[in-house]
Swiss-Prot record:
InterPro entries: FA_synthesis, Phospholipid_synth_PlsX-like. This is Phosphate acyltransferase. GO terms for biological process: fatty acid biosynthetic process; phospholipid biosynthetic process. The gene is plsX. Gene3D superfamilies: Isopropylmalate Dehydrogenase. It comes from Vibrio vulnificus (strain YJ016).
């Protein structure tokens, strides 16, 4: 079995080593081929390992870094002052092939800026994009991009996002994904010039299976496998859907935990529904991929708990196995040839 090495920014996220270290240890038991390099404050990391009764070994190592990038740092400042940081070092381990992928729950803007600076973009890509899986009512999942890396885009950039998203989704689905552009209506006359031009470009290529427009109320209805939009729209949609799912889960959970007769009735009536709603829990889909780079970088939610971070590490393992950057590069090459002829 070929090993897969993930560089984990141990200082990233809201809870730092208190979550990243247990997640790394748990991930090792989930994925027998996995090795983890924890980057960050060695004293804090080893302290957490001691609490777990775990010592660094052949599968888990620690590389000390003097500083971390805070969530409040602007990307430009983080880029200038990133030397010696846990996030930068994790990305550099991918760049020099010590690690196969990087996972971080740290500052999104800084992660994107550093990844782009260190790993560079694939040929034919203007900007990287954040993509993540979303649950659907049918029990499957779809993928949406961009989720906040680029708040404004032109049509060519959205077209590139569609090509990259299709390549990633295909590695999960093992079939040609249905690609749609998020719009205010399904009719061809609806929408602004940006989405209309993007749809025009997608309808002219054989590189993706374009199915037209979808509206916001169809995002979770399995109407498409890949949903394309700019980062502003995507981030708002993502946060709204996550908040709605968490609201329903917490409301039913609160009712079921009540000690009164009302709680007893709720446990009888809603136990099956609660189990169904848990499949919509955003933690199960934690791990947004930063596509368009010459390496694999996974962004975890800053607020992720241990199990959610394990899911992000799992996404990194999957993308390494499926050689996602190479798949995207091949798809882009086909598009460039298609446009040339």
């Amino acid at each position: 079995m070929q090993s897969i090495t993930v560089a984990l920014d141990a200082m990233g996220g809201d809870f730092g080593p208190r979550v990243t270290v247990p997640a790394a240890v748990q991930a090792l038991s989930h994925f027998p081929e996995l090795k983890v390099i924890l980057t960050g404050d060695q004293q804090q990391i080893t302290s957490q390992l001691s609490l777990l009764g775990y010592k660094p070994d052949a599968r888990l190592s620690v590389q000390h870094c003097d500083r971390m990038i805070s969530n409040s740092e602007k990307p430009s400042l983080a880029l200038r002052n990133s030397q010696g940081s846990s996030m930068r070092h994790a990305i550099e381990l991918v760049a020099d092939s010590t690690a196969d992928a990087c996972v971080s729950g740290g500052n999104t803007g800084a992660l994107m800026a550093l990844s782009r600076f260190i790993l560079k973009l694939l040929p034919g890509i203007d900007r990287p994009a954040l993509i993540s899986a979303l649950p659907t009512v049918t029990g499957g999942r779809s993928w949406m991009l961009d989720l906040g890396a680029n708040v404004s885009c032109d049509a060519d950039t959205l077209f590139q996002f569609a090509v990259m998203g299709s390549a990633l989704a295909e590695e999960h689905l093992n079939r040609a994904p249905r690609v749609a552009v998020l719009n205010v209506g399904e009719e061809e006359t609806k929408g602004n010039d940006l989405v209309k031009r993007c749809a025009e470009l997608l309808s002219q290529t054989q590189a993706v299976h374009f199915v037209g427009y979808i509206e916001g109320n169809q995002i979770l209805k399995n109407a498409a496998d890949v949903i394309v939009c700019d980062g502003f729209v995507g981030n708002v949609c993502l946060k709204a859907s996550e908040g709605t799912a968490q609201l329903f889960i917490e409301k039913i959970k609160t009712s079921m935990m009540a000690s009164s007769i009302k709680g007893w009735i709720a446990r009888i009536l809603f136990s099956e529904l609660f189990n169904e709603l848990k499949t919509l829990n955003p933690d199960q889909y934690n791990g947004a991929s930063l596509l368009g780079l010459r390496g694999i970088v996974i962004k975890s939610h800053g607020s992720a708990d241990v199990s959610a971070l394990v899911n992000a590490i799992g996404e990194a393992v999957h993308e390494v196995k499926r050689q996602v950057p190479s798949r995207i590069s091949d798809r882009l090459e086909a598009v460039l040839l298609e446009r040339h002829y």
